[in-house]
Amino acid sequence: MNLSDYIRKRNGVPLGASNSLRNMMIRSLGAGKFSKFWKYWNPIWSYYLGKYIFKPLKIILPPALSLLITFAFCGFIHDLVIMIIRWDFALLLTPWFLLMGFCVIIGDYAKIDYSKFTWPIRASINILIISGCLLIAYQIQI
């Protein structure tokens, strides 16, 4: 699947469509599982992470470990940009993304599904998970 097809599948609209950001926000925040949130969030970034990080890792490692490494890599790339701009070493987003990766794995393992709730409740649950992971990451930032 190429990038354009991937984005159309995730957002329901073609790459560059005027309502793609809106669709991404509605679909990701309204996801009934935290793992589904990540299926819709930032499809361009997730396409390349999946193709060049997750899938190659999954060949040699268990899927859960591959997912955690992919989340940590994504967080580290975000941290790296901040470190270059600030010219100072700090890791906040790496542990944040790693914690969110753990939430994806735990949620899928425990079969946590809140898709029967209304969109505002689903969005609140997803925002709560993301915010909770960020608060914990602030406590352990390096």
Question: Can you say where each PLM-predicted feature lies in the sequence?
Answer:
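Membrane-interfacial catalytic/cofactor-binding modules of polytopic membrane enzymes
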Residues: 1-74, 120-142
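Active-site His/Glu-centered metal-binding helix of metallohydrolases
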Residues: 76, 80-81
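Extended hydrophobic/aromatic segments used for targeting, binding, or gating
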Residues: 82-118
